[in-house]
Amino acid sequence: MKNILSIQSHVVFGHAGNSAAEFPMRRMGVNVWPLNTVQFSNHTQYAQWKGCVMPANHLTEIVQGIEEIEQLKSCHAVLSGYIGSAEQGGHIIDIVKRVKAVNPDAWYFCDPVMGHPEKGCIVVPGVAEFLCKDALPVSDIIAPNLLELETLSMQKVTNVEQAVMAARTLCDKGPDIVLVKHLSRAGYRTDRFEMLLVTKEHSWHVSRPLVDFGERQPVGVGDLTSGLLLVNLLKGESLQTALEHVAAAVYEVMVTTKEMGEYELQIVAAQDRMVAPNHKFWAIQLD
């Protein structure tokens, strides 16, 4: 069974970061080792929250403990998401290097959390710079949203063709695979939720219905998306098949959440539909 070291935020109530990705990844059939960058009472789109950012050296200490019991070599991928401080970033890169030193076949999947296309940047100073300068070159897979794609590539993206070009700019700097988690205003249609999966040689586009939650959009969708893609790829699915499953699985979670009238993602209620979606969305190869 595959093992994923997932370094992300954690909320006690609700679903964001590891709290959004950990259960779905396990439900898909992999082991997850959650390592939390922050621990908050709830996600930060509520009016208030409590909690703290973990000390940066805490991340390294935990991984060192795993290494000392000779289990780090069984880690197949490191997944990083929300980073609570720029200092944590340096420790995460060191962790990736430690894992790859004992398992050269391990992947680093970077979810470069900077913000939401409609909300602007939500991370502390220094994190965006770390992601561009340090995380991008060592990542094997990276999964930006539209704003993050523009920041990482230093290109304005207004359509799908430009998004593919920007993603290939990232491939030239490090990762083999780029998932654009949400094309937003750069997509073909504003009433659809569109994603791209891009390599140096090929690209695929997938579109699904946009589930309208009004002004109160659920948080953690990107974390769920990244986790599901990583699991699919670790299990040996093709890029196209993996993208199609992610689109359908996330749609099932969104529809279930909408049907139940909830704000928090209903990942437990939707678990069976997530693993075996009722809907199918075909990924179209662009080149």
UniProtKB/Swiss-Prot annotation:
GO terms for biological process: pyridoxal 5'-phosphate salvage. Gene3D superfamilies: 3.40.1190.20. ATP binds at residues 111, 143, 148, 181, 208-211. Its EC number is 2.7.1.35. One of its GO terms (cellular component) is cytosol. GO terms for molecular function: ATP binding; magnesium ion binding; pyridoxal kinase activity. Keywords: ATP-binding, Kinase, Magnesium, Nucleotide-binding, Transferase. Its cofactor is Mg(2+). It catalyses: pyridoxal + ATP = pyridoxal 5'-phosphate + ADP + H(+). Pathway: Cofactor metabolism; pyridoxal 5'-phosphate salvage; pyridoxal 5'-phosphate from pyridoxal: step 1/1. It is an enzyme of class 2 (transferase). Substrate binds at residues 9, 44-45, 223. It comes from the Bacteria. Homodimer. Pyridoxal kinase involved in the salvage pathway of pyridoxal 5'-phosphate (PLP). Catalyzes the phosphorylation of pyridoxal to PLP. Belongs to the pyridoxine kinase family. PdxY subfamily. This is Pyridoxal kinase PdxY. It comes from Photorhabdus laumondii subsp. laumondii (strain DSM 15139 / CIP 105565 / TT01). The gene is pdxY.
